[in-house]
A protein has these predicted regions:
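N-terminal accessory interaction module
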Residues: 1-63, 155-181
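Short alpha-helix boundary/capping elements
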Residues: 59, 92-93, 108-116
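Extended, non-catalytic structural segments that build the interaction scaffolds
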Residues: 63-76
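Short acidic alpha-helix initiation/capping motifs at coil-to-helix transition points
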Residues: 76-84
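Short, surface-exposed acidic
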Residues: 90-105
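Alpha-helical oligomerization segments
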Residues: 110-120, 128-188
């Protein structure tokens, strides 16, 4: 048993920002190799987004902004290597199946190394292209905020805004707003 990254979609934004979005639940690799022989200035906007912040899904060969660390069996790992080897042959012209398998094994081993975190840890990547053309990757983990003291922990992470009472402010709500008076005020 090992751990590998699996694509996750928290909202539909990946379907808008990438040319091809990975489906949730695909095994994933960093995927930076997909840009090694490409001039960044020649990439489309969506391709640049994938270069900057995408993980490559191994079923659709689409991109995902986030991955989650999950356990994987030896068979699932071998399947991921096979899927990636096919992609390396078909899309990137690996000269032989043997070389494609070696490169795929190396990529999957790197993906495993990213998963030294607890299961369910969310991973994100940020890439920059150096002046030399080298791609620099930085990986980070995202964690849920501790809401253990929240009176409504089930919905605590769903709030877009939190209302906080400030000391010295009236707790009584304003019942009426006079919009006509507001419109007549001098705005200079």
């Amino acid at each position: 048993m090992t751990k590998l990254p699996r694509t996750i979609r928290l909202d539909p934004s990946d379907t808008f920002i990438f040319e091809q979005a990975a489906e949730p639940g695909e095994w994933a690799v960093s995927g930076s190799f997909a840009f090694l022989d490409r001039e960044p200035s020649m990439l489309t906007r969506k391709e640049r987004t994938a270069l900057r912040s995408g993980f490559l899904g191994l079923r659709s060969y689409g991109w995902s902004t986030l991955c989650v660390v999950v356990e994987a069996s030896d068979e699932e790992r071998a399947e991921a290597v096979d899927q990636l080897a096919v992609y390396l042959r078909e899309a990137h012209g690996a000269p032989s199946q043997e070389l494609a398998m070696m490169a795929a094994e190396e990529e999957i081993a790197f993906a495993e190394s990213l998963c030294q975190h607890p299961v369910q840890t969310i991973l994100a990547v940020q890439r920059d292209v150096e002046e030399t053309g080298e791609i620099r990757e930085r990986f980070r983990t995202l964690h849920a905020r501790d809401r253990s003291g929240d009176p409504d922990p089930l919905h605590a992470n769903l709030r877009a805004f939190t209302i906080v009472e400030k000391a010295g402010e009236s707790a009584d709500p304003i019942d009426e707003v006079d919009l006509q008076a507001f419109l007549k005020t001098d705005k200079t």
